[in-house]
């Protein structure tokens, strides 16, 4: 959820390197999970990180060099503008950096696959059982839900943007940011492949970024824009279409069959907020990049529950301050900040 400089500033190179290595483990684990547990989540390899502004092309070069030299991450390929048509049918981009180790997947299918694996292993999942509050009691915790109470020796809070009033301290360190996506009608194999010939997922390095990929049934799934002041656009299709058609003008007027949205949990420094206090654990602050960081964080918390809290202690050294004035004032401040960076995205 974070670039490496904030991690290195808090933990030093060795500490940041350990968290980086944990992310590499998570990437390998994510590749193996569907095979190990027998489910499909549309896992596909390949990510193209693009630059729109001339001054941001250098960021691609810089990361390619730093990844190899400092973090041992090899294989990144710089894609010059004259090569981009082999990757993406858009004139919007000046250059790209291809990562053959990165991947994209369907997170809903991943969630269903993992849930089924948990139940096969004897785990129990209670859906639609909202936790209202909790308190310490004896050597454990008592959690009050809408349908009854639960007693437990250890409590893990993994609520992300939906922590709300369940834990006021944690909620003050998070800002729920609305994000939304659309999926086009099926484009047909030939037309879909013409948009992204190598079937990689694409993001750009703007502050307010676009991100998109193809689906197995030849739709374009596209996200762009966000809201800091709560809620969702009244018409997600209308809000997202200009971003999509800016990238792919050849899709102007295409039917958008699906539209949905939700909230991501942004921390002030965009660093993950993971830690413990006694037998109360928490995982949050993925800031829009939760698939791999949440797996790495879950491993750290699982290890701590089993007696090894070394990695969790590293995470807990990351500084995650409260938003000034709490969420009431954080959203307007973040919206102002977003407006500033959106202006910077133009030049």
Where are these regions (language model features)?
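General beta-strand structural signal in soluble alpha/beta enzymes
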Residues: 77-80, 125-127, 145, 157, ...
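General small-molecule cofactor/ligand-binding pocket signal
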Residues: 42, 76-79, 124-126, 257-259
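Generic structural signal for well-ordered, non-membrane alpha-helical segments
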Residues: 16-19, 23-27, 56-60, 103, ...
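Dinucleotide-binding Rossmann-like beta1-alpha1 core, especially the glycine-rich loop
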Residues: 1-81
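Helical element adjacent to the flavin cofactor pocket in flavoenzyme catalytic cores
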Residues: 58-69, 91-153
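Active-site substrate-recognition segment that forms the wall
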Residues: 28, 36-44, 131-133, 149-278
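Helix-loop-beta segment of a Rossmann-like dinucleotide-binding subdomain
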Residues: 9, 13-15, 40-49, 83-117, ...
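C-terminal catalytic lobe of FAD-dependent flavoproteins
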Residues: 226, 230-232, 237-346
């Amino acid at each position: 959820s974070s670039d490496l400089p904030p991690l290195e500033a808090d933990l030093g190179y060795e500490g940041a390197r350990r968290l980086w290595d944990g992310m590499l483990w998570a990437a390998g684990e994510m590749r193996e999970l569907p095979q190990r547990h027998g489910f499909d989540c549309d896992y596909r390899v390949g990510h193209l990180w693009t630059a729109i502004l001339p001054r941001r092309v250098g960021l691609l070069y810089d990361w390619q060099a730093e990844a190899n030299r400092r973090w041992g991450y090899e294989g990144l390929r710089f894609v010059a503008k004259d090569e981009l048509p082999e990757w993406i049918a858009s004139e919007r981009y000046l250059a790209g950096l291809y990562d053959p180790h990165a991947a994209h997947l369907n997170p809903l299918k991943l969630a269903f696959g993992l849930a089924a694996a948990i139940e096969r292993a004897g785990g129990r999942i209670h859906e639609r059982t909202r936790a209202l509050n909790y308190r310490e009691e004896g050597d454990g915790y008592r959690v009050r839900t809408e349908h009854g109470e639960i007693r437990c020796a250890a409590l893990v809070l993994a609520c992300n943007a939906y922590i709300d009033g369940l834990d006021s301290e944690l909620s003050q360190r998070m800002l729920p940011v609305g994000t939304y996506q659309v999926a086009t009608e099926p484009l047909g194999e030939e037309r879909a492949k013409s948009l992204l010939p190598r079937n990689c997922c694409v993001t750009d390095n703007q502050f307010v970024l676009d991100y998109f990929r193809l689906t197995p049934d030849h739709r374009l799934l596209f996200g762009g824009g966000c809201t800091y002041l709560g809620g969702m656009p009244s018409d997600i299709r209308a809000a997202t279409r200009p971003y999509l058609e800016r990238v792919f003008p050849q899709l102007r007027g295409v039917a958008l069959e699906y539209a949905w949205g939700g909230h991501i949990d942004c921390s002030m420094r965009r660093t993950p907020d993971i830690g413990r206090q006694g037998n109360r654990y928490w995982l949050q602050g993925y800031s829009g990049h939760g698939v791999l960081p949440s797996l790495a964080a879950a491993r750290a918390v699982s290890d701590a529950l089993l007696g090894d809290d070394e990695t969790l202690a590293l995470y807990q050294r990351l500084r995650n301050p409260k938003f000034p004035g709490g969420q009431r004032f954080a959203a307007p401040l973040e919206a102002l900040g977003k407006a500033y960076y959106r202006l910077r995205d133009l030049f």
